[in-house]
Amino acid sequence: MIKSECFTRQWCEQVAQRLNYNDIQLIEKVVRALSLLEMLIKSGCPFHFKGGTATMLLLGGATNRLSIDIDIICPPGTEIERYLSDFKDFGFTKIDLVERKSPGKNIPKSHSKFFYQLAYTDRVSGEGYILLDVLYEDCHYQNTLEIPIVSPFIELDSEPLNVKVPSIGDILGDKLTAFAPNTTGIPYYKKEKVCSVEIIKQLYDIARLFDRVDNLEITAQSFRRIVTVEMAYRDIDNLEAVFDDILQTSILIATRGKEGVGQFDILQDGIKKIKSFIHTSNYHIDHAIVDSAKAAYISTCIRKGVTAVEKYPGTPEIVLDMSIAPALTGKLNKLKRIFPEAFYYWAKTSELLQDN
């Protein structure tokens, strides 16, 4: 279990100094999110842990992105309220009533806010919250595993609890469905809220998960299962539209809005704002250009039934004799000199599209 001192301002300041990351508010949110996760496990709630915080635990030191929400999948019919009664034992002061809603898309979800007293302020009224998102459906992952809740943001007073998560290949397939803002993914807007950061978080995670897989067999199976469900929720009947969405969104980033379909200004806003969620490293448009090339390559491999991946070997010279096939815009050739890794994946993507 998480030590009680981890919920103090002093602890958050220590973590901030150790990680060279100064946003104490987000550090505390990570601690509180992991405490909520422990509560769900101790309650006996039947769930699979997914989303950004699961990716953070799964990748460990291979990712520097902070995640502060808890996303889980529960079997249909689960009464989540039964498992939330011990919230005060885990440092929370109150819960907003669980809200079950399917906002026009027939998605069986609920949302709960777990409130806590802020450690980094002396104001009695200083309050923060952690969001619990629950999706009620069968698990569509090919492989799952149990991993310990271990993080540089917490210390434990006993053996870590284990949580059930998708495999890296599975969660990569899941994340890919979410990076399609015009179809199955996080949209550019939810009502009046701009979702720029949420979209770029998916892109960031996709690239780092891809770095950890050797082939796309599991990813492809996971993607096809999950995207089928997401399409049904949204009344989409054309899988090619989803593949095109991922491709066009990636082109939009690669060409800085000159080509592609979507809203580059929103994507650019997300690229700027995601910096506040990343510690010990930076993130800007140059990184997003490389990451979007990986997303395009992964989705095109799945689209064409290719599971063996040809990863960039790290030597820029390899791209000297490569070119972008006519299946994609020639503007991508401009990446060759400055972004050889991005160019490599775009050249491979264009080959796959041209050959089929």
Regions found by a protein language model. Give the residues of each.
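A generic N-terminal leader/anchor concept
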Residues: 1-53
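Catalytic cores of NTP-dependent nucleotidyl/adenyl transfer enzymes across multiple folds
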Residues: 4-5, 15-19, 30-34, 102-283, ...
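Short histidine-centered catalytic/ligand-binding loop motif
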Residues: 19-22, 71-77, 192-193
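Active-site nucleotide-donor binding segment shared across nucleotidyl transfer reactions
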Residues: 38-70, 74-76
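Short, conserved acidic/polar surface loops in the N-terminal third of protein domains
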Residues: 59-62, 82-86, 143-146
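Metal-dependent nucleotidyltransferase catalytic core
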Residues: 73-108
